[in-house]
Amino acid sequence: CFFSLNVKNNKKKKYKVNKEIGFLAHIKKNIFILGLKGELRIQNVKTKKIIKSILIEQDIKLNRINDGKTDPKGNLWFGTMDNLERKIEKGSLYKLDKNLNLTKVDKNYRITNGPAFINENNFYHTDSSKKIIYKIKINKKDKIISKKIFKKFSKKDGSPDGMTLDKNKNIWVAHFHGACVSVFNKNAKLIHKINLPAQNITNCAFGGQNNNELFITSATKGMNRADLKKFKYSGSLFSVKSNIRGIQQKKFNLKDAKKRSLL
């Protein structure tokens, strides 16, 4: 399942799906694209009508889709991972364009998270299991021309998880098993840290009326009683007001969808 939250009246709504969900991206009105286990699904979440299903990695039984984001043109980028979180490099990074063409851009990941786009050709992407944030450059044909380690986390930092960018192109990174969100500038220098009363921080995104409110998700996965006592708000959604605005996330671009009888 997944939830929506109206920040004006604090109303929460639950939506049920029949598979484990990694991410969702908005297309229009009640129509979203969902990243599910083994499947990308375009669905009207209000009526529950499934409009289109795209099967992903059916030949790798224990893999699932994890995180996903849109780029500045509205293309969808998402990654896969081993569902048992074994230290095997079966995860890949994919791009889905407005015509629903699927391209495998990168491979040999354990746990994919992100990406976060600086511009059309440059983005950050994470392998959480390896504790590495990469900085990747691609050409117009989506071929990687540069892939460098941007930041390597230490054991005490936890693992880099989901991330987002602000208007100044600083990267905000959730720390799984690290109880914080860190902000790094383009030179990987730590410029700010938000400590949180939850151990496993999973993702962060800017929203709110002025796009200056950071929404932060967390999880209780793998925590014992002592951990839950120490971090009693684990599993909660947090919001933090900032004096910096985030980059507006693009909707998934399916502008030819009407002609193709998709929407």
Predicted regions and their residues:
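Short loop/turn segments that connect beta-strands within beta-propeller blades
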Residues: 6-10, 44-48, 96-100, 137-142, ...
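A short beta-strand motif characteristic of beta-propeller blades
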Residues: 9-16, 51-58, 100-107, 146-153, ...
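Blade-level signature of beta-propeller repeat domains, shared across WD40, Kelch, NHL, RCC1
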Residues: 205-263
